[in-house]
A protein has these predicted regions:
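...captures the hydrophobic TM-helix bundle architecture rather than a specific catalytic motif
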Residues: 1-177
Length: 177
Protein backbone atom coordinates (compact mmCIF):
# COMPACT_ATOMS: atom_id res chain seq x y z
CA UNK A 1 0.00 0.00 0.00
CA UNK A 2 2.70 2.47 0.97
CA UNK A 3 4.54 1.69 -2.28
CA UNK A 4 1.53 2.92 -4.28
CA UNK A 5 1.48 6.09 -2.20
CA UNK A 6 5.18 6.59 -2.88
CA UNK A 7 4.48 6.39 -6.61
CA UNK A 8 1.88 9.17 -6.39
CA UNK A 9 4.31 11.48 -4.65
CA UNK A 10 7.13 10.55 -7.06
CA UNK A 11 4.85 11.54 -9.95
CA UNK A 12 3.96 14.79 -8.19
CA UNK A 13 7.62 15.64 -7.51
CA UNK A 14 8.41 14.90 -11.16
CA UNK A 15 5.71 17.34 -12.32
CA UNK A 16 6.74 19.97 -9.78
CA UNK A 17 10.44 19.85 -10.59
CA UNK A 18 9.76 19.72 -14.32
CA UNK A 19 7.66 22.90 -14.08
CA UNK A 20 10.08 24.66 -11.74
CA UNK A 21 13.38 23.72 -13.37
CA UNK A 22 12.13 24.15 -16.94
CA UNK A 23 9.47 26.90 -16.80
CA UNK A 24 7.67 27.39 -20.09
CA UNK A 25 6.59 30.56 -21.84
CA UNK A 26 3.00 29.88 -20.77
CA UNK A 27 3.97 30.71 -17.18
CA UNK A 28 6.30 33.56 -18.11
CA UNK A 29 9.43 31.40 -18.27
CA UNK A 30 10.08 31.97 -14.54
CA UNK A 31 9.38 29.94 -11.43
CA UNK A 32 7.33 30.56 -9.48
CA UNK A 33 5.08 32.56 -11.81
CA UNK A 34 5.47 36.32 -11.29
CA UNK A 35 1.99 36.88 -9.83
CA UNK A 36 2.46 34.32 -7.04
CA UNK A 37 3.18 35.52 -3.50
CA UNK A 38 4.80 32.58 -1.75
CA UNK A 39 4.36 31.69 1.88
CA UNK A 40 7.27 32.29 4.19
CA UNK A 41 8.57 28.79 4.98
CA UNK A 42 9.78 29.85 8.41
CA UNK A 43 6.32 30.54 9.84
CA UNK A 44 3.39 28.11 9.62
CA UNK A 45 5.18 25.61 7.35
CA UNK A 46 8.05 25.32 9.84
CA UNK A 47 5.61 25.03 12.75
CA UNK A 48 3.80 22.25 10.88
CA UNK A 49 7.11 20.51 10.23
CA UNK A 50 7.96 20.58 13.93
CA UNK A 51 4.45 19.36 14.80
CA UNK A 52 4.79 16.36 12.50
CA UNK A 53 8.29 15.54 13.75
CA UNK A 54 7.02 15.70 17.32
CA UNK A 55 4.04 13.51 16.40
CA UNK A 56 6.40 10.90 14.99
CA UNK A 57 8.27 10.99 18.29
CA UNK A 58 5.12 10.60 20.40
CA UNK A 59 3.94 7.69 18.26
CA UNK A 60 7.35 6.01 18.56
CA UNK A 61 7.20 6.55 22.32
CA UNK A 62 3.76 4.89 22.38
CA UNK A 63 5.09 1.99 20.31
CA UNK A 64 8.04 1.42 22.65
CA UNK A 65 5.71 1.66 25.64
CA UNK A 66 3.48 -0.98 24.04
CA UNK A 67 6.45 -3.29 23.54
CA UNK A 68 7.37 -2.81 27.20
CA UNK A 69 3.79 -3.35 28.40
CA UNK A 70 3.29 0.19 29.74
CA UNK A 71 -0.39 0.67 28.88
CA UNK A 72 -0.77 4.15 30.40
CA UNK A 73 2.17 5.52 28.38
CA UNK A 74 0.81 3.97 25.18
CA UNK A 75 -2.50 5.74 25.70
CA UNK A 76 -0.77 9.04 26.52
CA UNK A 77 1.44 8.77 23.44
CA UNK A 78 -1.52 8.01 21.18
CA UNK A 79 -3.58 10.89 22.58
CA UNK A 80 -0.67 13.30 22.06
CA UNK A 81 -0.15 12.04 18.51
CA UNK A 82 -3.85 12.47 17.71
CA UNK A 83 -3.79 16.00 19.12
CA UNK A 84 -0.71 16.87 17.05
CA UNK A 85 -2.33 15.45 13.90
CA UNK A 86 -5.39 17.62 14.50
CA UNK A 87 -3.25 20.70 15.17
CA UNK A 88 -1.31 20.09 11.95
CA UNK A 89 -4.59 19.82 10.03
CA UNK A 90 -5.87 23.04 11.62
CA UNK A 91 -2.74 24.94 10.62
CA UNK A 92 -3.01 23.54 7.09
CA UNK A 93 -6.60 24.79 6.83
CA UNK A 94 -5.51 28.19 8.15
CA UNK A 95 -2.71 28.31 5.59
CA UNK A 96 -5.13 27.50 2.75
CA UNK A 97 -7.55 30.19 3.89
CA UNK A 98 -4.78 32.81 3.87
CA UNK A 99 -2.88 31.77 0.75
CA UNK A 100 -2.52 34.49 -1.90
CA UNK A 101 -3.16 32.04 -4.74
CA UNK A 102 -5.72 29.44 -5.73
CA UNK A 103 -5.70 25.93 -7.15
CA UNK A 104 -6.80 27.05 -10.58
CA UNK A 105 -5.15 29.41 -12.99
CA UNK A 106 -1.52 28.26 -12.94
CA UNK A 107 0.72 25.28 -12.44
CA UNK A 108 2.12 26.53 -9.13
CA UNK A 109 -1.26 26.64 -7.40
CA UNK A 110 -2.26 23.30 -8.89
CA UNK A 111 0.91 21.53 -7.78
CA UNK A 112 0.94 23.23 -4.36
CA UNK A 113 -2.65 22.36 -3.49
CA UNK A 114 -2.48 18.90 -5.03
CA UNK A 115 0.61 17.93 -3.06
CA UNK A 116 -0.20 19.58 0.27
CA UNK A 117 -3.88 18.66 -0.01
CA UNK A 118 -3.13 15.02 -0.76
CA UNK A 119 -0.63 15.00 2.08
CA UNK A 120 -3.17 16.66 4.38
CA UNK A 121 -5.69 13.97 3.42
CA UNK A 122 -3.11 11.37 4.44
CA UNK A 123 -2.63 13.13 7.78
CA UNK A 124 -6.40 12.97 8.37
CA UNK A 125 -6.51 9.27 7.44
CA UNK A 126 -3.47 8.63 9.65
CA UNK A 127 -5.09 10.48 12.54
CA UNK A 128 -8.21 8.33 12.13
CA UNK A 129 -5.99 5.25 12.02
CA UNK A 130 -4.37 6.33 15.31
CA UNK A 131 -7.82 6.94 16.85
CA UNK A 132 -8.72 3.36 15.93
CA UNK A 133 -5.47 2.18 17.54
CA UNK A 134 -6.35 4.13 20.68
CA UNK A 135 -9.77 2.47 20.77
CA UNK A 136 -8.19 -0.94 20.31
CA UNK A 137 -5.65 -0.18 23.02
CA UNK A 138 -8.40 0.86 25.43
CA UNK A 139 -10.25 -2.36 24.58
CA UNK A 140 -7.18 -4.48 25.33
CA UNK A 141 -6.61 -5.67 21.75
CA UNK A 142 -2.88 -4.89 21.68
CA UNK A 143 -0.27 -6.86 23.58
CA UNK A 144 3.52 -6.43 23.68
CA UNK A 145 3.92 -9.43 21.38
CA UNK A 146 0.74 -8.95 19.31
CA UNK A 147 0.17 -5.50 17.79
CA UNK A 148 0.52 -5.64 14.01
CA UNK A 149 -2.27 -3.07 13.51
CA UNK A 150 -0.35 -0.63 15.67
CA UNK A 151 2.86 -1.24 13.73
CA UNK A 152 1.08 -0.76 10.40
CA UNK A 153 -0.31 2.52 11.72
CA UNK A 154 3.15 3.62 12.84
CA UNK A 155 4.68 2.78 9.46
CA UNK A 156 1.95 4.78 7.72
CA UNK A 157 2.38 7.77 10.04
CA UNK A 158 6.14 7.83 9.62
CA UNK A 159 5.68 7.64 5.84
CA UNK A 160 3.43 10.71 6.04
CA UNK A 161 6.10 12.46 8.14
CA UNK A 162 8.86 11.71 5.64
CA UNK A 163 6.75 12.88 2.70
CA UNK A 164 6.13 16.16 4.53
CA UNK A 165 9.86 16.73 4.98
CA UNK A 166 10.33 16.44 1.21
CA UNK A 167 7.30 18.69 0.55
CA UNK A 168 8.55 21.27 3.04
CA UNK A 169 12.00 21.30 1.44
CA UNK A 170 10.72 21.41 -2.16
CA UNK A 171 7.63 23.60 -1.99
CA UNK A 172 8.23 25.91 0.90
CA UNK A 173 11.99 26.32 1.26
CA UNK A 174 13.42 25.69 -2.22
CA UNK A 175 10.41 27.30 -3.93
CA UNK A 176 10.71 30.37 -1.70
CA UNK A 177 14.33 31.03 -2.56
Amino acid sequence: FIASEVMFFVAWFWAYFNASLFPTEQIGAIWPPADIHLMDPWHIPLINTLILLLSGTTLTWAHHALQEGHRKEVIQGLILTIALGLIFTGFQVYEYMHADFEFSGHIYGATFYMATGFHGFHVIIGTLFIIVCLGRMLSGHFKPDHHFGFEACAWYWHFVDVVWLFLFAAIYVWGYY
